[in-house]
Structures are given as C-alpha cells and as structure tokens.
Regions:
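Bacterial Sec-dependent N-terminal signal peptides
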Residues: 1-30
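N-terminal, active-site-proximal structural segment of metallo-dependent hydrolase catalytic domains
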Residues: 24-123, 129-143, 330-334, 361-364
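Metal-dependent phosphoester-hydrolase catalytic domains
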Residues: 27-33, 172, 227-237, 245-364
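Second-shell loop/turn segments in exported
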Residues: 29-30, 65-76, 98-106, 132-133, ...
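Active-site beta-strand/loop signature of hydrolases that rely on acidic residues for catalysis
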Residues: 41-46, 76-79, 83, 90-113, ...
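Short, solvent-exposed loop/turn elements at domain surfaces
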Residues: 48-55, 204-205, 306-308
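Structured beta-strand-rich core segments of catalytic domains in phosphoester-bond hydrolases
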Residues: 107-194, 200
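Extracytoplasmic, non-cytosolic globular domains
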Residues: 132, 178-184, 189-277
C-alpha cells in the first residue's frame, strides 16, 4: 500500500492576537465552573448537503431536480434551514453563543456552507464563517469547517489528498483531510490549536475488505500530526470526523493508537474522547438495530493537562448531541437519528448521524 499526498494551502494574514472586543466579554453563562472559560469544538456529518445544480465532473446526478432524490429548491432550502438550526444549537448547553469550531462532512461545495452560515447567522444570531477546499471525491462531497468569527481566528488551512493503492490494483481517491490551524480565543488571550477534519473511506464491500482504505487514512492523519510536531512539539491537536470505524477498530486503535483511557496516553499520543461512551451503548448512528460511533473526536496529549491555567486550553468533557429534535419519536426507528430521506423518501429531517463535540476549559 502506498500513500500519495497532495497539499493545498491557503493562508490568512490576520490580526489574530488582538484583544477580544467588548461584545466577546459580554456577561454570558460560558463557565464550566466558577472562574473557568469553556469552548465547544464539534463535528457534524450533514448527510448529503447538496445544492440543486450539477457540478461539472462530479456524479451528483441523484441530487438534481430530475434525479433519484427529486432534489428541488424547496427540499434544499428546507435542508439548509434544518441544518442551520441544528448547527446553531451545538455547544449551547454551556455557552449560549454556541460552538467555536465545527467540522462538517458530506457537503457539496462552499456555496452550500455559505447558505448554511447565512441562515444560522440571520435567524439564530450566530457569527459563523465557512472554510472548504474542493477534493477529488467522485460524488463531489467534501469536508469543511465552520468557525465563530470572534471565538476562533484561522491562520492557515491545508488540504491533504488521500490515495490508497491496494495489492489487487484497486484505488480509492476520496475526500481531502482538512487541517485548520488558528487561535482559540478567550478573555483576549488566544492559544493556537490545529483541527484536522476527516471523512474516511466507507465500508462499502464489507468492513474487512475495505479496512485498508481507513488504515491508510489513519496513517495520513498521523503523518499530518507528525509534521506539526516537528515545528511545534507541544502543539494542541484535535482530530475529528466520520471515520467509518468505531474507536476499537484497527485504524483508530492500532494505526493512530488513540487510547480509551487518558492515563494510557504517552507524550504526543492520542486520547479517543468517544470510546467510553460507546462502551456505555451510546452511539452517533444506528445500523441494523445497533449503535456505531463513527463520528469521533480524538485529542492529543498536550490537551490532557489536569492543571487549569490562564491562557491554556485543556480538555474537560465530550458529548453526543442526541437531542429530541434530532431523533425519531415514534415507529420502528424510534430513538434513532431523524434523517433527511430514508429509502429515497423525503422526511424533512436532519441527518443520519448525531453531532459529537468536546469542551475545552481554562482558568479565567
């Protein structure tokens, strides 16, 4: 197996180090405990956020007005409205302003994210801005990144293309891995973090036969992190995405070496914030009557400090955002994610995955 990486780079030259404005210092209930600031970082698979226009060279025909999904402007507008509401609610359990950063998957293009942000900002008072780099996926779906323009200041964006070659001659050319570096703000003192957004190869053809693609994706993530460590040995890194594997699967446990318990994590190692929730039977998507937790958030050792300090973010807790409005309330699918479509039938729901999130805290 070989890995081929193509790197796409965009750089913002911005005033990241400016003090927070008075609006940011508004008195809001953003504390984990008295004297602590909290920030939410989330991931959400948006389940086929396609517009109604054909993208040249992409197999998006199913999501056109005359395609299999009969994807009309009305359906698209309802999808955007639903997802904007869901996105606007992420993190509000601990900060009414919502999440600082949100990685997303299954988005057709940057235009869809602009529509999503515009809806969330105008209707729900959010301050979201989007980032997306076009990748080579055949259907045209990409990963992206939304950020609150006050709570997070992006400084650099890299996209890494994955090509996995197999012994039988097969090849996967799929979604970019998107690395967004920037400054997570809090009381005027920013701290740099790196967020890597993923959507790993699917299990099409079976979990075992498709495993090499996800193992290769895990190796690519590890190489991205290693390159960050070369310049920043104490860098703080958040790995997130729809990995199409559970925390105990080979790609996560053995290739990336993301651990179940924080005390097992070595210097520059990784902690899987979702593993123990799956052990308790809590998942992010349901399949054939059982739960999986493919929507994972993995953090590195520098984020695991148990000492709270001013100006330094550290991990507090993880959450699966399985709120009632995102959940089927009756019938045989009761208790599972409320989807946009099922078996080709329009349901006007949200998506087949629950969002996942972590909270970082620091001393005020």
């Amino acid at each position: 197996m070989k890995i081929s990486i193509m790197k796409h780079t965009m750089i913002w030259v911005a005033a990241m180090m400016l003090a927070m404005t008075s609006a940011v210092n508004a008195q809001v209930n953003e504390k984990a405990n008295e004297g602590q600031f909290v920030r939410c970082i989330a991931f959400y698979n948006l389940e086929n956020l396609f517009d109604t226009i054909h993208d040249e060279g992409k197999n998006d025909y199913e999501y056109l007005p005359d395609g299999g999904m009969k994807w009309t402007s009305l359906k698209y507008e309802n999808k955007v409205k639903n997802m904007a509401y869901a996105v606007s609610q992420l993190g509000t359990d601990y900060d009414p302003r919502g999440a600082a950063c949100i990685g997303v998957a299954e988005v057709e293009n940057i235009g869809c994210l602009y529509d999503l942000c515009a809806e969330a900002n105008s209707k729900y008072g959010r301050r979201l801005k989007p980032i997306l780099l076009e990748g080579p996926d055949r259907r045209g779906v990409d990963v992206g990144f939304l950020y609150d323009s006050i709570m997070f200041k992006p400084s650099k964006v890299n996209g890494f293309e994955l090509k996995a070659h197999y012994a039988d001659g097969g090849e996967i050319k799929t979604r970019l891995q998107l690395c967004v570096s920037g400054y997570l703000m809090g009381d005027g003192r920013p701290e740099k973090i790196h967020v890597i957004v993923n959507h790993w190869p699917s299990r099409y053809g079976g979990e075992l036969s498709s495993r090499p693609g996800r193992d290769t994706a895990a190796m690519l993530v590890k190489s991205i992190c290693d390159s960050i460590y070369l310049k920043e040995p104490k860098a703080k890194i958040v790995i997130m995405g729809d990995l199409n594997d559970d925390p105990y699967n080979h790609s996560c446990k053995d290739v990336l070496k993301a651990r179940k318990h924080r005390e097992e994590v070595e210097p520059q190692g990784y902690f899987n914030t979702m593993w123990q929730m799956l052990d308790r039977g809590i998942g992010s998507l349901a399949y054939n009557g059982s739960w999986n937790l493919f929507d994972q958030i993995i953090i590195n050792e520098p984020l695991l400090s148990e000492k709270l300090e001013s100006g330094k973010w550290t991990y507090w807790k993880a959450q699966i955002f399985n709120k009632p409005f995102l959940t089927v309330q009756e019938g045989k699918d009761k208790g599972t994610p409320f989807r946009t479509t099922k078996a080709g039938v329009w349901q006007n729901g949200y998506g087949d995955h629950y969002p996942t999130m972590i909270y970082l805290i620091r001393k005020k």
